[in-house]
A protein has these predicted regions:
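Short, amphipathic alpha-helical "lid/cap" segments that border enzyme active or binding sites
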Residues: 18, 94-101, 198-209
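Hydrophobic alpha-helical connector segments
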Residues: 77-114
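Helix-turn-helix
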Residues: 16, 24, 28-58, 62-66
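Short alpha-helical scaffolding segments that buttress acidic/His motifs in well-ordered protein cores
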Residues: 100-104, 118-125, 170, 174, ...
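C-terminal peripheral helix-coil segments that are non-catalytic and often amphipathic
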Residues: 2, 138-219
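An amphipathic alpha-helix adjacent to DNA-recognition modules
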Residues: 11-19, 53-80, 136
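Amphipathic alpha-helical segments used for helix-helix packing
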Residues: 94-99, 111-138, 181-186
Length: 219
């Protein structure tokens, strides 16, 4: 008798499901995307979604974790490299900002899937609280807190509250820019290109650096 084993989630069928689900979730959100929608667009039987991911929430989590783990590893690696380079001194502010914003901007600029994931990140706060909170706690908190600690060393005159506020502003900024809505092209009359990483990165770094260097506003 042949025993059927569960196929690994990185096989062709599961990867196709992840790619299609990523696009649909980023465009319509968790609640408005159905298993039937994903099945129809991917041309994969609904039973195989349950086979690989158990249910819609399991698929959503897998979609999110697939790229988030890559992004966060890159972010942590850049931070680690900056710490080594600093030789126990505070890390230069612009290098901290670069380590934080470059991975998602790079990901969004390289392929359509990366851009879909950044859009998915941007709309995570609109998803059911139990899904949003669980994903943020599992995936993002550890690395984000590492950056808070390093920013406190680099900016000792800023309160932790101000540092966290300003870091949140940076998150909103890069998520909007990386989503490449086309708004930048409209208001600049085509002079600026939102999808151009070489153009966007220095603007973001300079803007965020000045934001962190502005006078403390909270005790």
């Amino acid at each position: 008798m042949v025993t059927k084993t569960l196929t690994a989630p990185d096989n062709k069928t599961a990867t196709r499901l992840l790619n299609v689900a990523e696009t649909l979730f980023s465009e319509h959100g968790y609640a408005m995307t159905t298993v039937r929608d994903i099945s129809a667009k991917s041309k994969v039987n609904q039973a195989l979604i349950n086979y690989h991911f158990k249910n819609k929430r399991g698929l959503f989590n897998a979609v999110f974790e697939r790229r988030a783990t890559v992004l966060l590893k890159e972010r942590a690696d850049l931070l680690r490299a900056a710490k080594i380079k600093a030789k126990k001194k505070p890390i230069p502010l612009k290098e901290l900002i670069y380590a934080f914003v470059y991975p998602p901007l790079r990901m969004a600029s390289e392929d359509k899937g990366g851009q879909s994931f950044v859009k998915l990140q941007a709309r995570l706060h609109n998803e059911p609280k139990e899904i949003e909170s669980a994903l943020r706690a599992k995936l993002y908190d550890k690395v984000s807190l590492l950056f808070v600690d390093e920013l406190k060393r680099t900016l000792p005159k800023l309160s932790e509250s101000s540092i966290c506020w300003r870091l949140i502003f940076i998150m909103g900024l890069y998520l909007y820019v990386a989503s490449n809505t086309g708004r930048l092209e409209v208001i600049s009359k085509g002079k600026a290109k939102g999808g151009n990483l070489k153009q966007a990165l220095p603007e973001i770094l300079n803007f965020c650096e000045q934001g962190f260097l502005s006078a403390p506003t909270q005790p």
